[in-house]
Amino acid sequence: MTLFIDGDALPNILKPILLRSVERLKIPTKVIANKKIHIGDSPCIEMIIVSQGADRADDMIIELLSPEDLVITADIPLADRVITAGGHAIDHRGTRYSSDNIKHYLAMRNLFESIRESGEITNGPKPFTQKDAHAFANQLSAFLQRLEKRKK
C-alpha cells in the first residue's frame, strides 16, 4: 500500500500525525502538490511537484494509484475518483469515504457549491480544530490497523 497526500490544502497540524504513522509503519508515501510541502524528513516520503493548473495534482494521484492505496484529501471529487479506482480516501477531518457514502458527500458538495455561487451562502468551511485533528488521527490509525491485520 502507498499513502498519497493531496498536499494542496493539508493543515499543518496533521503533518506530525502523518509523519509518525509513516515512520512507525514504514509506509511508502507520496505528497503531491503544485508547490513543495514539507511533511518531515523520512526516507519513506517522496515529494512530487506538479505544474500549476486545475486538477493536476488530482490527475497525478489517480495516475499513480493502485487498488487498496490510501489518499488523504479534502477534495471530494478526488475522493470519488479514488473510490471508483478501488482506493481508499480519508479527509482532513477524519471522514472515511467509501463506495457507500461518496455519492452522498459529492451531491452535498455540489449543492453547497451551487448555493455559494448564487451568493446565498458566503462563508466557507468551519475552521479546522484540534477535535478535527483528533478525529483524523483516529480514522488513520483504525485504517492502518485493519491493513496490518490483513497482512498477517
From Swiss-Prot:
Protein name: UPF0178 protein NIS_0137
Organism classification: Bacteria, Pseudomonadati, Campylobacterota, Epsilonproteobacteria, Nautiliales
Classification via PANTHER family: UPF0178 PROTEIN YAII
InterPro entries given in the database record: UPF0178
Organism: Nitratiruptor sp. (strain SB155-2)
Any Pfam family the entry gives: DUF188
Family (UniProt): Belongs to the UPF0178 family.
Transmembrane segments annotated in the record for this chain: none
Signal sequence range: none
Origin: domain of life: Bacteria
HAMAP family given in the database record: UPF0178
